[in-house]
């Protein structure tokens, strides 16, 4: 059975260095480009006809549109409408990364959301963006969110450090949650796939048990791919709500 960790190895496709800095075009980069291309193609096909009675592509796009619009409306309010393009793009990028990682794509096949550096970069963009929005909207009054309104002043020495730690841990928790779930799920699939191959090669009936389990886990993993994209996006909406409304 192949090492289940090998699937997370970044492979350079176009080696390139600038001095001592490695900026090679890797399988991870290729999958990100592929995701963006497929998202663009999907949205282009969905708006091409603009029929009164929507077709399959348009219906799927409208489902995603209404889903994200509703998420923003419920968690941020009407003021969150201006941030729809970013939140929608974020959701689609995470979702396609999760789903494409499940596909047996030759040469470039890779789940970029299973690498913490990628998920942390996305989480950092959300964190910095939300912080900038908070200060742009409230100025220095944004700092008041680190000391809950109505709390006794004597508790400031305890509450402020706790709020600061909670605030600055947001990008880490956001990144690790997505990375860990995708990594663990793919490892389980790889291990169970190895059992199916090894047992199925010698015994038909014993191999059927792990195959059935693998099929169930695969279906579950597709659900988790959608769920993790949802969780990453809704937490971003909650952070955006805090920046706009200050709790």
Curated annotation (Swiss-Prot):
Belongs to the ATPase A chain family. The keyword Ion transport applies. Keywords: ATP synthesis, Cell inner membrane, Cell membrane, CF(0), Hydrogen ion transport, Ion transport, Membrane, Transmembrane, Transmembrane helix, Transport. This is ATP synthase subunit a. It comes from Paramagnetospirillum magneticum (strain ATCC 700264 / AMB-1). The gene is atpB. InterPro entries: ATP_synth_F0_asu (IPR000568), ATP_synth_F0_asu_AS (IPR023011), ATP_synth_F0_asu_bact/mt (IPR045083), F0_ATP_A_sf (IPR035908). The chain crosses the membrane at residues 23-43, 90-110, 116-136, 145-165, 194-214, 215-235. GO terms for molecular function: proton-transporting ATP synthase activity, rotational mechanism. The keyword Lipid biosynthesis does not apply. GO terms for cellular component: plasma membrane; proton-transporting ATP synthase complex. F-type ATPases have 2 components, CF(1) - the catalytic core - and CF(0) - the membrane proton channel. CF(1) has five subunits: alpha(3), beta(3), gamma(1), delta(1), epsilon(1). CF(0) has three main subunits: a(1), b(2) and c(9-12). The alpha and beta chains form an alternating ring which encloses part of the gamma chain. CF(1) is attached to CF(0) by a central stalk formed by the gamma and epsilon chains, while a peripheral stalk is formed by the delta and b chains. Its main location: membrane.
